[in-house]
Amino acid sequence: MSLDSSSKSTFISQKIDTGILGEELVAKWLNLEGWQILHRRWQCPWGELDIVATKTTSSLRDSSNYKFPILAFVEVKTRSRGNWDQDGLLAVTESKQAKLWKTAEIFLSDRPELVDYSCRFDVALVRCNYIRKNSQAQKKLSIEQQISELTVDIGNSVELAGYQLVLHNYIASAFIIHLD
């Protein structure tokens, strides 16, 4: 059976973006860990920041390394089983890191109120596998409603929009940019 072009575009528009599901999961986890999400999918001509979040030092488990609130630029990599790049870790190349750095600089240039924040680049690795069509209960809830009901812990799977998602690794201060 072949689909005409209008059927194909309808199918594609209804397909769920698993990358966005991964970002939703990580944002929920960050909120549960006491982070405030400032921006999601912030874009400029240089690139995109998946999540920009802040946390006060008083709410950190190990606050000895930070004198000021933390501003985290979080790169989320969502991958299915059997991927070729170590669940997205190998996709954060030096080139990608430089692009994230430049994008973060542009983000900060318009926000003088964040000048004293300790900035870092974190990487969140999410596994995502299609499991089945949405249950009747899930079909009645938007993705936002489904997310609001989730409890997210590193290493534990959750079901969202017919997918099984696992935040399997969160790497704080995943890389440092060396300025030459």
Curated annotation (Swiss-Prot):
Gene Ontology MF term list: nucleic acid binding
Matches recorded under InterPro entries: Restrct_endonuc-II-like, tRNA_endonuc-like_dom_sf, UPF0102_YraN-like
Q: Which Pfam families match?
A: UPF0102
Q: Which family does it belong to?
A: Belongs to the UPF0102 family.
This protein is called what?
UPF0102 protein Tery_0733
Source organism lineage?
Bacteria, Bacillati, Cyanobacteriota, Cyanophyceae, Oscillatoriophycideae
